[in-house]
A protein has these predicted regions:
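Structural preference for beta-strand elements that scaffold enzyme active sites
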Residues: 88-90, 128-132, 153-155
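Noncatalytic carbohydrate-binding groove/subsite architecture in carbohydrate-active enzymes
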Residues: 135-182
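Acidic/aromatic-lined carbohydrate-recognition and catalytic surfaces
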Residues: 1-75, 79, 83, 94-149, ...
Length: 182
């Protein structure tokens, strides 16, 4: 999709599968997740003659979830794999699906609305299919991806993982019980 997008004219359906700008200062207040490797969340593409948005590495451009065609393709991909017998999906980097000026671009209401639609779709067509949210957030933010039982059925608890190692190293349960108390 990206090769097609970068070779298509501005404003075309193909180009709009990704988030592009002429101004790399757009969303300037959004944190850069991998600061050791990326100087910006925007990377110049010499073919498209525009900057494309990536929340992680420059070789991982973000899809434009505001584009209904992108959403349609996601539904088709889910259907394809469910028809092949897959009954669970890890939804990677789920807090970062949408971009909104004036926000930190994390945990936005649009993300939850999309997840509700996707969950309703699989519940109707493929009952028993599960979604695992990969949301590297503090527990109170990550828990929101359960919705009211209408988003993801499971969720990683990222803060507990490094604390397990810390507890072993310190020979103390406190790092684990502390994060669960939060």
């Amino acid at each position: 999709w990206f090769h097609r997008a970068r070779n298509s004219p501005k404003g075309s359906q193909e180009r709009n599968f990704y988030v592009w700008t002429d101004d790399p200062q757009q969303y300037k207040d959004v944190r850069i997740i991998f600061q050791d490797f990326e100087a910006s969340n925007w990377t110049w593409d010499p073919v498209a003659q525009q900057y494309y948005w990536h929340r992680f590495f420059h070789h991982q451009p973000d899809l434009n979830y505001d584009n209904p065609l992108v959403q349609e393709e996601i539904f088709k991909i889910i259907d394809y794999w469910c028809e092949m017998g897959v009954d669970g999906f890890r939804l990677d980097a789920v807090p970062y699906l949408y971009e909104r000026e004036g926000t930190n671009r994390e945990n936005l209401p649009e993300t939850h609305a999309f997840l509700k639609r996707l969950r309703k779709h699989i519940d109707e067509k493929y009952p028993g299919t599960a979604f695992l949210a990969e949301a590297n957030m503090w527990p109170e933010d990550a828990a929101s991806y359960f919705g009211l039982g209408d988003e993801c059925q499971m969720n990683y608890h990222f803060p507990v993982m490094p604390r397990m190692f810390m507890a072993v190293q310190q020979e103390d349960r406190y790092p684990i019980t502390d994060i669960f108390d939060q």
